[in-house]
């Protein structure tokens, strides 16, 4: 039963909502299409706000699981009133009005859960005067949905959403002369189906949107109504709804993303099943589907305007135009199979894109605004992936809406998004990574993940760390040059992954061009843009990492330099102390010589030794001097002569050489001036005193870096 048939049937208004709830229209699934026969009891309740009393109304068609709610019926009547306000538009136009508005969320039902499409319109739509309202902000008269602000002033959909989300009036600069509603391919055969689907999908959208929970009838305002182009499919709602508030400011440029492709896919048959089809923006569908989708409410002339407005999303109206299937034209002929296919597609989507579906929210945030064309419209990617999952059900071509500038964006169902997948991995991966090869992934949100993982894994921050360890080794070796070399190596290692990423991106672009052939470049371009953004972000992180590592290396150098300076200062102090000790020892020896000189004949033999030591006061004593014997007693005298005991020599390296020297008593010093001819060596009493004198030389190993503790 088509929408026109249902709408043409006059219905008896009754004021009892109980009767409405009691008499739920039965859902009859025929082979050709799911037609709903409404019982006479299922009549609209009279709504005080409706200016029109006798309105042909689409009866609520509850699925077996979902009971009919009087509130829904009121909304249905209100929306039907709205649709009937202009000179009675064809039923297609009524659905046009109904579809762009976000649905209310009743509990989710199976593929063909049905509630009238009128539920999608908010209660405010019924308040519009019949004379044709004018937006109080932008003065426009063309809008898919009229809204009111807190003061009751009539606003267009865009201004109302902008005010609601941003708390301030929508700037006039954002005003566009084209309507922002989404295209719908609605033919008489599919009108009833679409009406069912809008109601059926409302539960999914609304149940998944936490933000629109407080406004059951008006959830569309904030959630899906905000861009009219926020054609978030039921699967998209989980992740994409967070985008909605952010995208609302960009409502003029439809953020419709993923749902576009799905809409194209399922537009003919899936309208009943998937709410996202109704909310799909017309960007991709615009050229071919505009006449189909906008029989009356939005003239096809606005489609080019929509293209211009949403050009970032429009990636390929040209290729998509050829690729956009003739299925919309074949809706009447292919009712049975499309419906069944829609059921299967919905099933697949619900499985893959259910509440458990995990999308990267960070990416979604990036994809929020189409105003910034550079941002990655992740939602479009998600939509394309989800539509791919349901591609088995229908042969329609997906046009993924991505902000990329390429003109071709439609992907055939059968093609898994191989092209976008290779690009994403390449961001993090080096040239050797298989990212250039196409990956088949059922959902693109997973595709968005790989770059992050590879950024963590492939982009090796480790090589710089290893280089830092080499810096430490070089520093410990004391070689500043080694540190600089390691710095150079480090910078090279850091540069190489970035260059590798750039090469990979280029290679991926080439591969994508080769792989696309008949496929959408739109997905590839969107992925490329995402890759570029992630690559730039990744480069920034690499630069920050390099800076931190360089700072660490500088700190290591500084600490090493400080250590070396401290060591040098300590060595100087030791040298000074050794010199002082040497001077003290020399003074002691001089004093000792004086004592010997003062002694009588008994000291005549020993006097030459001290007498000669003043001459040697400036000399450093080495252990080899023990073997030096004088032919002339008045000249070279070994410092150890006539010293009994052991000389302990301590080097600054804390080595101690204990040289036990037995000074022979026959070592006699003959003096020419002294007449004592004996060969006897006389040990003087001072020699028997125990003294520890340190004879130290500051000149190192052989020259007397050794501290000599002499027991005299």
From Swiss-Prot:
Q: What happens when the gene is disrupted?
A: Leads to altered sensitivity to fluconazole, LiCl, and copper.
Sorted alphabetically, the Gene Ontology BP terms of this entry are: cellular response to copper ion; cellular response to heat; cellular response to lithium ion; filamentous growth; negative regulation of transcription by RNA polymerase II; positive regulation of transcription by RNA polymerase II
Keyword terms, alphabetized: Coiled coil, Metal-binding, Nucleus, Stress response, Zinc, Zinc-finger
This protein's species is: Candida albicans (strain SC5314 / ATCC MYA-2876)
Q: From the Swiss-Prot or TrEMBL record, give the protein name.
A: Transcriptional regulator GZF3
Lineage, opening ranks: Eukaryota, Fungi, Dikarya, Ascomycota, Saccharomycotina
Record's Gene Ontology CC terms? nucleus
Instruction: Name one molecular function that GO assigns to this entry.
Output: DNA-binding transcription factor activity, RNA polymerase II-specific
Q: What induces it?
A: Induced via CAP1 during oxitive stress, as well as during biofilm formation.
What is this protein's gene name? GZF3
Q: Low complexity bias located where? A: 27-84, 107-131, 186-199, 379-414, 499-532, 596-616
């Amino acid at each position: 039963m088509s929408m026109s048939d249902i709408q043409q049937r006059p219905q008896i208004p009754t004021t009892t909502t109980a009767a409405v709830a009691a008499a739920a229209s039965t859902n009859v699934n025929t082979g050709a299409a799911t037609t709903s026969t409404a019982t006479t009891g299922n009549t609209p309740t009279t709504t005080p706000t409706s200016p029109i009393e006798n309105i042909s109304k689409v009866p609520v068609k509850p699925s077996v699981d979902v009971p009919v709610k009087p509130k829904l019926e009121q909304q249905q009547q209100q929306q039907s009133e709205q649709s009937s306000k202009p000179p009675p538009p064809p039923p297609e136009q009524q659905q046009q009005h109904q579809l762009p508005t976000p649905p209310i969320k009743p509990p989710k039902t199976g593929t063909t859960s049905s509630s009238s499409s009128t539920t999608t319109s908010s209660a405010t739509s019924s308040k519009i005067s019949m004379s044709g309202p004018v937006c109080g902000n932008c003065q426009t008269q063309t809008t898919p949905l009229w809204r009111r602000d807190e003061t009751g002033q009539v606003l267009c959909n865009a201004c109302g959403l902008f005010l609601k989300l941003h708390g301030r009036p929508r700037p006039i600069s954002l005003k566009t002369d084209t309507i922002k509603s989404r295209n719908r391919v609605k033919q008489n055969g599919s009108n009833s189906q679409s009406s069912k689907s809008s109601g059926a999908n409302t539960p999914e959208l609304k149940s998944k949107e936490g933000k629109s929970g407080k406004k059951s009838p008006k959830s569309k305002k904030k959630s899906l109504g905000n861009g009219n182009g926020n054609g978030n499919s039921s699967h998209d709602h989980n992740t994409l709804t967070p985008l909605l508030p952010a995208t609302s400011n960009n409502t003029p440029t439809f953020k419709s993303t993923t749902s576009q492709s799905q809409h194209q896919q399922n537009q003919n048959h899936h309208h009943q099943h998937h709410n996202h089809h109704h909310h799909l923006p017309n960007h991709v569908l615009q050229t071919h589907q505009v006449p189909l989708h906008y029989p009356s409410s939005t003239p096809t002339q606005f489609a080019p305007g929509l293209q211009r407005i949403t050009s970032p999303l429009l990636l390929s109206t040209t290729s998509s135009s050829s690729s956009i299937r003739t299925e919309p034209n074949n809706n009447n002929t292919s009712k049975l199979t499309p419906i069944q296919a829609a059921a299967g597609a919905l099933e697949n989507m619900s499985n893959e894109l259910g509440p458990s579906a995990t999308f990267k929210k960070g990416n979604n945030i990036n994809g929020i605004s189409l105003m910034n064309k550079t941002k990655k419209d992740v939602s479009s990617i998600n939509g394309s992936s989800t539509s791919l999952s349901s591609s088995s059900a229908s042969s329609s071509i997906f046009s993924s809406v991505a902000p990329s500038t390429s003109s071709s964006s439609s992907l055939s169902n059968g093609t898994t998004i191989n092209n976008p997948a290779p690009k994403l991995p390449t961001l993090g991966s080096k040239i050797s990574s298989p990212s250039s090869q196409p990956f088949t992934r059922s959902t693109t949100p997973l595709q968005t993940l790989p770059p992050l993982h590879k950024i963590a894994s492939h982009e090796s921050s480790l090589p710089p760390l290893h280089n830092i360890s080499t810096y430490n080794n070089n520093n410990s070796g004391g070689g500043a040059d080694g540190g600089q070399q390691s710095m150079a190596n480090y910078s090279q290692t850091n540069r190489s992954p970035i260059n590798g990423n750039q090469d990979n991106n280029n290679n991926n672009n080439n591969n994508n061009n080769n792989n696309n052939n008949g496929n959408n470049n739109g997905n590839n371009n969107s992925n490329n843009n995402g890759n570029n953004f992630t690559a730039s972000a990744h480069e920034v992180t690499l630069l920050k990492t390099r800076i931190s590592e360089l700072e660490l290396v500088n700190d290591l150098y500084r600490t090493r330099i400080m250590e070396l300076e401290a060591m040098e200062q300590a060595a100087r102090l030791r040298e000074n102390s050794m010199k002082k000790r040497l001077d003290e020892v020399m003074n002691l020896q001089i004093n000792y010589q004086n004592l010997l000189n003062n002694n009588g004949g008994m000291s005549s033999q020993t006097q030459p030794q001290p007498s000669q030591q003043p001459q040697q006061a400036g000399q450093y004593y080495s252990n080899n001097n023990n073997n030096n014997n004088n032919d002339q007693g008045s000249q070279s005298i070994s410092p150890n002569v006539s010293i009994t005991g052991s000389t302990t020599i301590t080097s600054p390296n804390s080595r101690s050489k204990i040289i036990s020297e037995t000074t022979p008593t026959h070592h006699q010093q003959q003096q020419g001036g002294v007449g004592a001819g004996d060969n006897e060596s006389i040990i003087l009493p001072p020699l028997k005193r125990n003294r520890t004198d340190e004879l130290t030389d500051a000149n190192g190993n052989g020259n007397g870096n050794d501290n000599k503790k002499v027991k005299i």
